[in-house]
Design a protein with these regions (language model features):
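Alpha/beta catalytic barrel-like cores
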Residues: 2-106, 110
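Alpha/beta enzyme core
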Residues: 59-69, 80-112, 121-270, 276-307, ...
């Protein structure tokens, strides 16, 4: 398959917080999209094998958990969010582990920080100010999150305002109805417009996989978003009844692999919604390692969208060091 790049010099060029090459986008190849098929039973068998085949223990588990922290988008997306809550979340991002845990780990050379802090547009400026000097990017959910149902002009303006306020990553929401009625051209055109509005900011496309009916729909939507220029594909808003799971993740990861084989462009993956336990995070990391390789276990190619995962990771680290589990209140988020 031969694909030509739409923009030889992609708008925005390199990210300000990652040397990773941006996805410039490619023409919509409907023949490729229509060839996509997914076998759900095979996906379920493969996903079911991950936990049993990839277990890490003792010091290795501690190392994997430290890596997991660097892959988290610390998130607060609640209707009752306040500037104070966002500031407290950013304070946690600056110091994600208690000092006594860091001292016991004895890894002073490691700078353990989360991948980003993710907030609503109204709090982008607050987060940018609170994170100044850390190198931690601010991600803003956008385009009428979580439903994605608003006039195109409104959604584009929301992106532009978040970028102007300092967001370096924009998590946009696709219109699920476009996937359900197979309107691939419409979906492609919207993502291209969103990509242009993002400028230098990386664009993550939220599929809302729990509302797309089939794994084949999820795979096709993933491909269309990547062809349109998405830097990341993301499972969910966290507001759906069904959020991230290993089966859907395997579908999306294999589309990322296929896309990389055909285009040479590496796309990031972000599972989100319901990932609150360290053991679950390790399964997703094992899946990424087995399907895409160690190179994808980096913040510019893999993130967890999570609001409480860090709390359990801290508990597991403390248990690994002391043999005792601490109460959640010893690892407060905000």
């Amino acid at each position: 398959m031969s694909l030509r790049v739409i923009d030889k010099t992609p708008q925005g060029g390199q990210s300000t917080h990652s040397p990773h090459k941006r996805n410039p986008g490619f023409p919509l190849d409907l023949d490729w999209v229509e060839r996509v098929r997914m076998n759900r039973s095979a996906l379920e068998r493969r996903a079911g094998s991950i936990g049993a085949r990839r277990t890490v223990k003792k010091d290795y588990q501690l190392a994997w958990l430290l890596k997991a922290i660097t892959l988290i988008d610390l998130t607060t997306l609640n209707a009752d969010d306040t500037a104070g809550r966002v500031e407290r979340l950013c304070a946690k991002a600056r110091h994600p582990l208690r000092q006594d845990i860091l001292d016991r780990l004895d890894v002073p050379e490691l700078r353990i920080l989360p991948g980003a802090v993710c907030v609503y547009h109204n709090f982008v400026k607050t987060a940018v100010t609170a994170l100044e000097g850390t190198g931690i990017p601010v991600a803003a959910v956008s385009t009428a999150f979580p439903h994605g149902l608003a006039p195109l002009e409104t959604k584009l303006r929301e992106i532009e305002l978040s970028v102007a306020d300092g967001a370096q990553e924009i998590d946009i929401v696709i219109e699920r109805g476009m996937v359900l009625r197979q309107d691939w051209q419409g979906l492609y055109d919207q993502i291209r417009a969103f990509r242009k509005a993002c400028g230098d900011a990386h664009i993550k496309t939220i599929l809302g996989t729990g509302e797309l009916a089939t794994q084949s729909n999820i795979a096709k939507a993933s491909l269309v978003c990547m062809l349109a220029g998405a830097d990341f594909i993301k499972t969910s808003t966290g507001k759906e009844k069904v959020n991230a799971n290993l089966v859907t993740s395997l579908t999306m990861i294999r589309m990322i692999r296929w896309f990389a084989e055909e285009t040479g462009i590496e796309i990031g993956y972000k599972p989100a919604g319901g990932i609150s336990k360290a053991a679950d995070a390790l399964k997703y990391m094992a899946l990424m390692k087995e399907e895409l390789g160690n190179g994808w276990l980096q913040p510019h190619l893999f993130r967890f969208g999570a609001s409480t995962l860090l709390t359990d990771i801290e508990r597991q680290l403390e248990h690994g060091l002391t043999g005792h589990y601490a109460a959640d209140y010893r690892q407060p988020m905000v």
